[in-house]
Amino acid sequence: MTELTLKPGTLTLAQLRAIHAAPVRLQLDASAAPAIDASVACVEQIIAEDRTAYGINTGFGLLASTRIASHDLENLQRSLVLSHAAGIGAPLDDDLVRLIMVLKINSLSRGFSGIRRKVIDALIALVNAEVYPHIPLKGSVGASGDLAPLAHMSLVLLGEGKARYKGQWLSATEALAVAGLEPLTLAAKEGLALLNGTQASTAYALRGLFYAEDLYAAAIACGGLSVEAVLGSRSPFDARIHEARGQRGQIDTAACFRDLLGDSSEVSLSHKNCDKVQDPYSLRCQPQVMGACLTQLRQAAEVLGIEANAVSDNPLVFAAEGDVISGGNFHAEPVAMAADNLALAIAEIGSLSERRISLMMDKHMSQLPPFLVENGGVNSGFMIAQVTAAALASENKALSHPHSVDSLPTSANQEDHVSMAPAAGKRLWEMAENTRGVLAIEWLGACQGLDLRKGLKTSAKLEKARQALRSEVAHYDRDRFFAPDIEKAVELLAKGSLTGLLPAGVLPSL
């Protein structure tokens, strides 16, 4: 298990990817304690002085003007968690719940939330014990924070709801016992601090980012294999072309292709003096299209990296001045827009890959047997696999519609503009699955095309990509049940089998 000493506000994208990928043992850096304690003392002073402060001794949302008596403050926090745990849908996977919890711990530990170390330590204990609260997929509009998902996360601390441990559902009290805990009684402000925030939205989008990075890497490898399979040119990847334009994503993408393709190969030397002048756009313009996608990934990663370390609670406690100020950091618009841009990139990666698959099907364009199989007519080869790729790419065009432009007023129009960031983030997973399927078919097709080049080898790195597939999926000498081969290629891509072929430093979290 990975061990991480958390210094609040300093999580890196690489650490976030690791937290999403596998269980982690957290320890809070000792430097966090003074700020946490000071914020709690500030809240306690406000109560002692009988000052009115939103979320501490008032109602919530449209009920913010309702003053709550001091003897009801603990009940207020418990009622808040119970009433807001109103999500619906399938439970989130452990990897997502873990990421949400670590993001919440990171935010609360910065010392602007007025929540005791005891509560933060309880969340840490759950993470370390691999006890993951039941959080339904749906129920948040991304403002005022991810209230329903985070309420479900918080239920377990109160001894309510349920949690998963080693694949089994336990009651909250059983789950707490596994982590060596007992149910907590929340103090003033603590329920609101737990519920307010963009941690679910951010986790949803971060998963989409990690998937998109792996898809980008796979698309570069598959695109390089396709260049070789159809006897394409290396000239479009010449650094001078891309430096002349100046787009950094394009420049770096072209460099990735040069690294994978090398200066030459047996395949490229076999058509060195051919009379073909230019390749189709799906081959020639890969640096331009994939470079634009890389730029979107990097920009989204920057936004999400900031949000992962943000304080998105409301109100915020500024202990040094003794102030508690209401604002709107819970509004997840930055996350929604980042997710929307990731959707564009994921859709385009799949769209370009589908065009290369189609190119390989056409004997006039590819100089390969129709549908990549010999004895055509008796054999249909990749004919319907390409149709599947087209269906997946088409689905993604609809799914890529932006969510951040949508809004529905909630809480009796008090919360009259919302981000829809959770929906923006979670559709990325389906889109990634679709694009992974398209790339799997291209990978199968490009390797088949290279096989048909009668023993010619491509570059050393692309041969690794080829053999990674061929170690699991055999060449097609005749038609066979196709779906299992696509499933195996998808499985390999989901494991990141091609991600390691990219040079270090290209992708934000790798």
From Swiss-Prot:
Subunit field text: Homotetramer.
Transmembrane spans: none
Post-translational modification: Contains an active site 4-methylidene-imidazol-5-one (MIO), which is formed autocatalytically by cyclization and dehydration of residues Ala-Ser-Gly.
GO cellular component, one term: cytoplasm
InterPro entries in alphabetical order: Aromatic_Lyase, Fumarase/histidase_N, HutH, L-Aspartase-like, Phe/His_NH3-lyase_AS
Modified residues (2,3-didehydroalanine (Ser)): S144
GO biological process terms on file: L-histidine catabolic process to glutamate and formamide; L-histidine catabolic process to glutamate and formate
Pfam families, A to Z: Lyase_aromatic
Entry annotated with the keyword 4Fe-4S: no
UniProt keyword terms in alphabetical order: Cytoplasm, Histidine metabolism, Lyase
Annotated EC: 4.3.1.3
Gene that encodes it: hutH
Family: Belongs to the PAL/histidase family.
Species, as recorded: Pseudomonas putida (Arthrobacter siderocapsulatus)
GO molecular function, one term: histidine ammonia-lyase activity
Name of the protein described by the UniProt record: Histidine ammonia-lyase
Domain of life: Bacteria
Subcellular location: Cytoplasm
Residue location of crosslink 5-imidazolinone (Ala-Gly): A143-G145
